Curated annotation (Swiss-Prot):
Binding site for ATP: L25, R26, G67, K70, T71, T72, E133, D134, Y135, R176, Y186, R223
Keywords: ATP-binding, Cytoplasm, DNA damage, DNA recombination, DNA repair, DNA-binding, Hydrolase, Nucleotide-binding
Superkingdom of origin: Bacteria
Chief site of localization: cytoplasm
GO CC annotation, single: cytoplasm
Catalytic activity annotation: ATP + H2O = ADP + phosphate + H(+)
Region (Head domain (RuvB-H)): 260-352
Region (Small ATPAse domain (RuvB-S)): 187-257
Job of this protein: The RuvA-RuvB-RuvC complex processes Holliday junction (HJ) DNA during genetic recombination and DNA repair, while the RuvA-RuvB complex plays an important role in the rescue of blocked DNA replication forks via replication fork reversal (RFR). RuvA specifically binds to HJ cruciform DNA, conferring on it an open structure. The RuvB hexamer acts as an ATP-dependent pump, pulling dsDNA into and through the RuvAB complex. RuvB forms 2 homohexamers on either side of HJ DNA bound by 1 or 2 RuvA tetramers; 4 subunits per hexamer contact DNA at a time.
Naturally occurring in which organism (per UniProt): Borrelia hermsii (strain HS1 / DAH)
Protein name: Holliday junction branch migration complex subunit RuvB
């Protein structure tokens, strides 16, 4: 990698050389949370109203692709409500006693955050129905003929549920959430703000053009932007520079095999498979996922939203289909699906 651009040697302060904890990059307050303005504006009203009434915030349902800040926002809500938060995920709630153990130890007006809500077991969902609506839980004491159900009161709490698959959450459970918000992919402007903010936290100097290039390659996702920011810091550090320039980012992305549209090698594998193995589609998501060594869930949750956003693939009633832009991006002839050679010859042109 050519790191000709840059200025001074890195800061010798040992704090620069050791990675900060990931949580330090997460905003602590709603005012610091970049993007998702429609969600923030509504939440600020709901939080203020709940605090003024000295009540628990209504239950909150957060959905959207991974890496957009659902968990971060849950923590921010707890801070803004001046309360505690307990964090778990649906797969960890295996038996009724698991959810009962959590609900009975909550404080009044505290928050329970459950990630991957679409993976809750039916028996856990049924217990949450009563807990969310009446703030009570039914618990069976004893066994056999002597068994009896006892209804216990629990503190008035706020359940924040997050999922990447809102359509798979049971309707009765979904209906009990009073605040429903969907996260959208971030704009480049919003990602630039996140990169600039976090570069200060990581003690990294960034050129404006470098931040824009990094934002453009971050798939509309803060988690990806933060990961790339750390890698650019590594490249600059090893190269002996404390100013990350556009050329450094460009070279770094090329080393990571991320192209000018933000696509990585697996993104291109998906497009190549769709075009070269299935003649551009349409093809079912399960078949396409198997062809690239992914699960259907990971293909739908992580890769597809961005590929659709960039206009590279489209969903049809018969399956996934490559667009004309996908052929152009891979430098493939749409009339010759076996034209793999031209794609390889044009690979460097695809990157930068």
């Amino acid at each position: 990698m050519n790191l000709e651009e840059g200025s001074k040697l890195l800061n010798s302060d040992k704090n620069f050389l050791y990675d900060r904890n990931e949580s330090e990059l997460r905003p602590k307050f709603l005012r610091d949370f970049a993007g998702q303005s429609h969600i923030k504006e509504n939440l600020s009203v709901f939080i203020k109203a709940s605090r003024d009434r000295n009540e628990a915030l209504d239950h909150v349902f957060l959905s959207g692709p991974p890496g957009l800040g659902k968990t971060t926002l849950a923590s921010i809500i707890a801070v803004e409500m001046n309360t505690t938060i307990k964090v778990t995920s649906a797969p960890a709630l295996d038996k009724p006693k698991d959810i009962v153990g959590i609900l009975t130890t909550l404080d009044d007006k505290s928050i329970l955050f459950i990630d991957e809500m679409h993976r809750l077991k039916p028996v856990i969902e049924e217990m949450l129905y009563i807990a969310m609506e009446d703030y009570k839980i039914d618990w069976i004491i004893g066994q056999g003929p002597a068994a009896r159900t006892v209804r216990m009161s629990i503190p008035k709490f706020t359940l924040i549920g997050a999922t990447t698959k809102p359509g798979k959450v049971a309707s009765p459970l979904y209906a009990r959430f009073g605040i429903v918000s969907r996260f959208e992919l971030y704009s480049e402007d919003e990602l630039v703000k996140i990169i600039q903010r976090n570069s200060i936290i990581l003690n990294v100097k960034f050129e404006d053009k470098a931040a824009w290039l990094l934002a453009k390659s971050s798939r509309g996702t803060p988690r990806v932007a933060n990961r790339l920011l750390r890698r650019m810091r590594d490249f600059a550090q090893v190269g002996g520079y404390d100013l990350i320039t556009e050329n450094i980012v460009s070279d770094g992305l090329e080393m990571l095999k991320i192209d000018h549209e933000g696509l990585d090698e697996q993104d291109r594998n998906i497009l190549r498979s769709l075009i070269l193995k299935f003649k551009g589609g349409p093809v079912g998501v399960e078949t396409l996922a198997i062809s690239v060594g992914e699960t259907a869930d990971s293909l739908e949750d992580f890769y597809e939203p961005y590929l659709i956003l960039k206009g590279l693939i489209e969903r049809t009633s018969r399956g996934r289909k490559a667009t004309d832009f996908a052929y152009c991006h891979l430098n493939l002839n749409k009339n010759n699906h076996n034209d793999l050679g031209s794609e390889q010859d044009g690979y460097q042109g695809i990157l930068f």
